[in-house]
Swiss-Prot record:
Protein name: Leucine--tRNA ligase
NCBIfam families associated with the record: leuS_bact
Motif residue range(s): 'HIGH' region: 40-51
Keyword Ligase: yes
Superkingdom of this protein's organism: Bacteria
Enzyme Commission number(s): 6.1.1.4
Keywords: Aminoacyl-tRNA synthetase, ATP-binding, Cytoplasm, Ligase, Nucleotide-binding, Protein biosynthesis
Matches recorded under CDD domains: Anticodon_Ia_Leu_BEm, LeuRS_core
Keyword ATP-binding belongs to the record: yes
Stretches assigned to coiled coil: none
GO CC terms, sorted: cytosol
Organism, as annotated: Clostridium acetobutylicum (strain ATCC 824 / DSM 792 / JCM 1419 / IAM 19013 / LMG 5710 / NBRC 13948 / NRRL B-527 / VKM B-1787 / 2291 / W)
Single GO molecular function: ATP binding
Protein family (similarity comment): Belongs to the class-I aminoacyl-tRNA synthetase family.
Length: 812
């Protein structure tokens, strides 16, 4: 019978807690290892299999590191503000605070049932005033240093619900709640100046131990482009506008220019006879998301304004159009169109019968997007590539109509949310003093409990007069609080800093302590956060460094992503599909460690895969078998029937597998290849089980090997391993033990099995000494009885030896 069950889980969890086994030693930072999993959002009532796939394997890696001598800091908390709790409140009437704290209580129990090595005394919960006080402090620091500002910007607006929607709430251009078409509405909102750090965010990526795909995604998101900014004057007007282009060499081929529908110039440039069509087009553009507008497969549309611009290089008049594929917040919100050398411009010009003029030689047909000698470009004809660009920019700069420019796709971070369940923005508005930041001594600006959640067209906080009406900290007169709350990504942009000093009531963290504890050594979470959370956290770290609070450049030195656990049907798990897996049910039946080990063995950690109930059952059988093996080993160790001290063939074979397993598991653990680690453990289990059937055993080797295999399985099955360790060693705890080291000498075999082929087909396998010469190997192969029988009466033409693997005998 197996000695493992949920009772074993409970027994050892209680013991670990009583003895503070995993307490981080803040006075011993020489071998500090900060291991961090992205904290979870308590929107659902319980953790699902995906959470476990993030947390359990990383906990195994942390345990392994503890056993190799590291002082592991592995905190846990909850990203507790956000939209789902507020939507749940609108739907059910249950207050977000009540539902969130209840869910956190449930999830804490689940996480503890995992037996993870979390430092719970460092827990942070972002919706508590003692946390968001410092989120508000962060806002004020950025504001004081010119990195937070307020401006008008378009937001998703549902006319039916009378509320702003996050991008995630817009599905196919409609409100996910009521199905009404979403429009864009200009609102005055708060931004963080992440663009100030665009170049550093880009350059520092190459120094990080991060997945290449994630680094590539951030590089694309930042989107650095080197080119030129060209000024176009409007014909018969004092108006002018700039365009950014990476192909200034094609400037003579511009046959029209395009403005974004949101551009303020659109109204000024539109002639009266075109006004109605332009307004209608702008209204349609408001209903499209930026992703839809920039789609390469979507047919391009536009409308003529009736105005013309002057091409600054040849003084030709070109029509000014409005088109929704131009985004106002990217670049200058205007583009020059060269249909002969750009596919999008070519399609647009063809559709609207606009001129197409070739200015670059090359290609059999248009559009030709490569480089070549210029044609139809006046004084620049014959110039090519960079020389053409330099000559044209030089000419433009003489008249202040062009200049070199570096452009970034990255835009400033919009942090305002017209929602309730978030950290209040700590500013007030005074008629006399204007925008006034709340003094730090008055933080936190607490979120009121009694508010009206149902959408009214205004931020929910405006329904609380007690909250909104306040006194100006500057003049003492009447003031009104900001009614927007902060994006939840602001809360998660700095939580890794608070973990290290979570009980500090005087500051968000102690600078000296942080300088020793940070940066995070290993960070693990989903790849979907590449261009938001991971980018925002990098920005906040750099901003706080420059303000003087941090002495490091990057928050996360090493990053790993986990894959996705799918339902048994291979589809993404969801309640509506009925394919979700409850960790609680599996733990109740098989125990926490069976669940952990199945997650690590059944899937490549970076890839994930489809769930299998049979896989869980197979892992349960393996744990039972391992348990029986340890019981047998204990009996043999305590009551040896026959014992020897020398190292015979069986001992050398076991010792080889033992040391090979230690080496392989150690190396694969650091690669996060948990599935191969457990495969090695299974091979090791087979080898030790086989040795237990030998009559005359080396008891010292048996005990040492049994101790090592328990140590190796400990990170993967911590409760189970403690129980097995207690059986063999009868002392506490296996996690206070040193990780086993392999012996290089034991990895050199005295004998090796080789295959013998005759004309390419395997006829026999023999064991030979590893130090035999090639001639000796040939002789051993030809002396085998099966080989003799197969070659009898035949002419041996050639004998080919591949050392350590095979002998191929060619006969006729």
């Amino acid at each position: 019978m197996s000695t493992y069950s949920t009772k074993v889980d409970e027994k050892w969890q209680k013991k670990w807690e009583e003895t503070s086994l995993y307490k981080f030693d803040e006075n011993n930072l020489e071998k500090k290892l900060y291991v961090l999993e992205m904290f979870s959002y308590p929107s659902g009532a319980k953790l699902h299999a995906g959470h476990w796939f993030n947390y359990a394997p990383v906990d195994s890696w942390a345990r392994f590191k503890k056993m190799t001598g590291y002082n592991v800091f592995q905190p846990m908390g909850f990203d507790a503000f956000g939209l789902p709790a507020e939507n749940y409140a609108i739907k059910t009437g249950i207050h977000p605070k009540d539902s969130t704290l209840k869910n956190i209580e449930t999830m804490e129990k689940q996480l503890k049932s995992m037996g993870a090595m979390f430092n719970w005394d460092h827990e942070v919960i972002t919706c508590t005033p003692d946390y968001y006080k410092w989120t508000q402090w962060l806002f004020l620091e950025l504001y004081k240093n010119g990195l937070a500002y307020r401006k008008k910007a378009p937001a998703n607006w549902c006319p039916s619900c009378n509320t702003v929607l996050a991008n995630e709430q817009v599905v196919d251009g409609s409100c996910e709640r009521c199905g009404t078409e979403v429009i864009k509405k200009d609102l005055t909102q708060w931004f963080f100046k992440i663009t100030n750090y665009a170049e550093e965010l880009l350059q520092k990526l190459d120094e990080l131990d991060w997945p290449e795909k994630t680094k590539a995604m951030q590089k694309h998101w930042i989107g650095k482009s080197k080119g030129a900014e060209v000024t176009f004057k409007v014909d018969n007007s004092d108006l002018k506008f700039d365009v950014f282009t990476t192909r200034v060499d094609t400037l003579c081929g511009v046959t029209y220019v395009v403005l974004a529908p949101e551009s303020p110039l659109a109204d000024e440039l539109t002639k009266p006879e075109y006004k109605e069509k332009v307004e209608e087009y702008k209204l349609q553009a408001q209903k499209q998301s930026e992703i839809e507008r920039q789609s390469l497969t979507r047919e391009k549309t536009g409308v003529f304004t009736g105005s013309y611009a002057i091409n600054p290089i040849n003084n030709k008049k070109v029509p000014i159009w409005i088109a929704d594929y131009v985004i106002y917040t990217y670049g200058t919100g205007a583009v020059m169109a060269v249909p002969s050398h750009d596919e999008r411009d070519f399609a647009f010009a063809t559709k609207y019968d606009l001129p197409i003029v070739r200015v670059v030689e090359g290609g059999e047909e248009l559009p030709f997007t490569g480089y070549g000698p210029l044609v139809n470009s006046g004084e620049f004809d014959g110039l090519k590539g960079n020389k053409a660009k330099e000559a044209i920019v030089s000419k433009l700069s003489e008249n202040d109509l062009g200049r070199w420019k570096v452009n970034y796709r990255l835009r400033d971070w919009l942090v305002s949310r017209q929602r309730y369940w978030g950290a209040p923005i700590p500013v007030v508005y005074c008629e006399k003093c204007g925008i006034v930041p709340v003094p730090e001594k008055d933080l936190p600006v607490e979120l009121p409990y009694n508010v009206e959640f149902n959408p009214t067209g205004k931020s929910p906080l405006t329904t609380s007069e007690e909250f909104m009406n306040t006194t100006c900290p500057h003049c003492g007169g009447h003031a009104t609080r900001e009614s927007d709350t902060l994006d939840t990504f602001v809360c998660s942009s700095w939580y890794y800093l608070r973990y290290a000093d979570n009980e500090n009531s005087d500051a968000p963290f102690d600078k000296e302590k942080i300088s020793k504890m940070l940066p995070v050594d290993k960070y693990v979470g989903g790849p979907e956060h590449a261009c938001m959370h991971l980018l925002y956290a990098r920005f906040i770290t750099k901003a706080l460094r420059d303000i003087g609070y941090l002495n490091f450049d990057e928050p996360f030195l090493s990053l790993r992503h986990q894959g996705l656990i799918l339902g048994p049907d291979g589809q993404k798990m969801s309640k509506s599909k009925g394919n979700t897996i409850s960790p609680d049910d599996i733990i109740a039946e098989h125990g926490s460690d069976v669940f952990r080990m199945y997650l690590m063995f059944g899937f490549d950690y970076a890839e994930g895969g489809a769930w299998s109930d049979d896989g869980v059952k197979a892992m349960s059988k393996f744990v039972d078998r391992f348990s029986r093996m340890i019981e047998t080993a204990k009996e043999e160790i305590n009551n040896p029937k026959n014992s020897k001290t020398d190292m015979g063939k069986e001992e050398k074979e076991l010792n080889y597998v033992r040391n090979h397993s230690i080496k392989a598991v150690t190396e694969d653990m650091d690669k996060f290849q948990f599935n191969t680690c457990i495969a090695r453990l299974m091979e090791f289990t087979n080898s030790l089980s086989k040795y237990l059937t030998v009559d005359n055993k080396n008891i010292k080797l048996l005990k040492d090997t049994t101790i090592d295999i328990i140590k190796l399985i400990a990170p993967f099955a911590p409760h189970f391993a403690e129980e097995q360790w207690n059986i063999i060693e009868e002392k506490y705890s296996v996690f206070n033990e040193k990780w086993p080291e392999f012996d290089e000498k034991a990895l050199v075999k005295d004998e090796v099995e080789i295959a013998i082929q005759i004309n390419g087909k395997i006829k026999a396998k023999i064991n030979i000494a590893t130090n035999l010469s090639e001639d000796e190997i040939k002789s051993a192969a030809l002396a085998d009885d099966k080989v003799k029988a197969a070659t009898d009466g035949k002419n041996i033409v050639k004998v080919i030896v591949i050392k350590g693997r095979l002998v191929n005998i060619v006969v006729k």
